[in-house]
């Protein structure tokens, strides 16, 4: 377990690190990132310390709520044609936050089925079916190390947004499948650690990321999402 510590201040955070170190011993490693927040750079930094055949990106504001979720994801990711597996993420009221990502939705890309109940099947039951999609969120994303090394690290130009979608696009372009596994479920307490995108500076950064993503993947955006 690699935890990247990024300027935390709460005592309970560090108490949690100590508890994990006692529980997992040498399997747990805390590494420090002293720079500003850049989601791509922080994950790339942490991955340098990982030794496994598979890499799981997992946000600090998530909680696994379905037993065996990570095993389900790993079982799928072991297939040779699969490059990435993503999970179903729920808000704390058990409505859907993420059930896959659709290219071109909400402008550039957006989460599918956001706001429906966890027990709602959705259009053609697609909210609850294991399936191939264009992209999944990196809040909980499992990928092969070999694939990560083949397509390259997360693009650090995307400091906060679109880095996961960009990585999925690179993996799909390399010929691998992106799989959404709804039977792997987590709560995602989004924005509780960083805050919402509600300041002028954040909006300016977000706008730049949108333009960079469009410039990079214009042809694919014009063509449309093949899974939607």
What are these regions (language model features)?
Residues 33-50:
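Glycine-rich, basic loop-to-helix element that forms the pyrophosphate-binding segment
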């Amino acid at each position: 377990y690699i935890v990247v510590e990024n300027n935390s201040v709460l005592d309970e955070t560090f108490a949690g690190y100590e508890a994990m170190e006692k529980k997992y011993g040498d399997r747990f490693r805390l590494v420090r990132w002293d720079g500003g927040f850049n989601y791509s750079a922080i994950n790339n930094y942490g991955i340098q310390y990982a030794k496994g055949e598979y890499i799981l990106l997992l946000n600090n504001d998530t909680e696994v709520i379905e037993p065996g979720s990570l095993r389900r994801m790993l079982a799928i990711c072991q297939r040779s044609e699969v490059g990435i597996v993503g999970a179903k993420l729920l808000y704390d009221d058990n409505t859907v936050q993420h059930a896959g990502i659709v290219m071109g939705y909400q402008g550039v890309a957006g989460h599918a089925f956001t706001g429906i109940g966890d027990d709602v099947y959705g259009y053609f039951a697609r909210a609850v079916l294991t399936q191939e999609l264009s992209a999944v969120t990196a809040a909980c994303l499992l990928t092969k190390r070999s694939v990560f090394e083949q397509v390259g690290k997360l693009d650090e130009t995307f400091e906060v947004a679109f880095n996961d979608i960009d990585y999925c696009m690179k993996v799909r372009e390399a010929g691998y499948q992106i799989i959404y596994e709804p039977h792997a479920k987590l709560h995602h307490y989004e924005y509780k650690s960083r805050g919402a995108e509600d300041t002028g500076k954040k909006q300016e950064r977000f706008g730049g990321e949108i333009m960079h993503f469009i410039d990079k993947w214009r042809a694919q955006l014009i063509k449309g999402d093949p899974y939607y």
